[in-house]
């Protein structure tokens, strides 16, 4: 983890072949930057994690351990789709760039499956009795925002609290038009309404 390159040369000599090993050490770590800079991961937190390593020779094994600490913290905060990879780039002056993918939500699709789990009838999406705006007003999870599992769980709780739904299932899918982004599918089973009971 300490070296960025190793070159081995052989040289014939009177006593046989002599191996010359030249190692190129990693640069002194001066700064860790994020790409993109406006990530959910704060630069202050990254500096706190790497502060004790600034001014020392970069050790890529220790560096990867610190990246794991960052990933675990953000997963604990609910940002389970945040991906940190790298180092993406190591400059000669000791600035290391990490690539961050925040897990942006590109769309939230509401679906109403029938009893067989089908979403389409005669080539058209199956519609529910509940209007989309009634559902969307309960959702803090919105297109363009960063996926957060805790916020989505609270959204599901609010949907159940309306007493309009028997079941709420969530699935995630990739957005093929926007790599790195995700589509959230909300599959809603509506409560049966209008039941009448009576007796004598």
Task: Spell out what each predicted region is.
Residues 1-200:
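Periplasmic polypeptide-binding modules associated with outer-membrane biogenesis and secretion
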């Amino acid at each position: 983890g300490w070296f960025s390159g190793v070159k081995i040369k052989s040289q014939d000599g009177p006593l046989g072949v002599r191996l010359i090993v030249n190692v190129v050490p990693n640069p002194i770590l001066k700064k860790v930057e994020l790409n993109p800079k406006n990530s959910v991961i704060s630069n202050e937190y990254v500096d706190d994690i790497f502060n004790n390593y600034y001014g020392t020779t970069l050790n890529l094994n220790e560096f990867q351990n610190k990246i794991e600490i960052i990933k675990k913290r953000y997963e604990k905060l609910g940002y389970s789709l945040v991906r940190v990879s790298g180092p993406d780039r190591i400059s000669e002056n000791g600035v290391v760039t990490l690539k961050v993918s925040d897990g942006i939500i590109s769309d939230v699709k509401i679906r109403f499956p029938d009893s067989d789990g089908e979403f389409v009838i005669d080539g058209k999406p199956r519609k529910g009795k509940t209007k989309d705006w009634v559902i969307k007003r309960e959702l803090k999870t919105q297109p363009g925002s960063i996926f957060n599992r805790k916020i989505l769980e609270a959204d599901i709780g609010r949907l159940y609290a309306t007493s309009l739904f028997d079941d709420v299932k969530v699935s995630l899918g990739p957005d093929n038009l926007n790599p790195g982004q995700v589509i959230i599918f909300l599959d809603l089973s509506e409560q049966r309404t209008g039941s009448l009971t009576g007796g004598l």
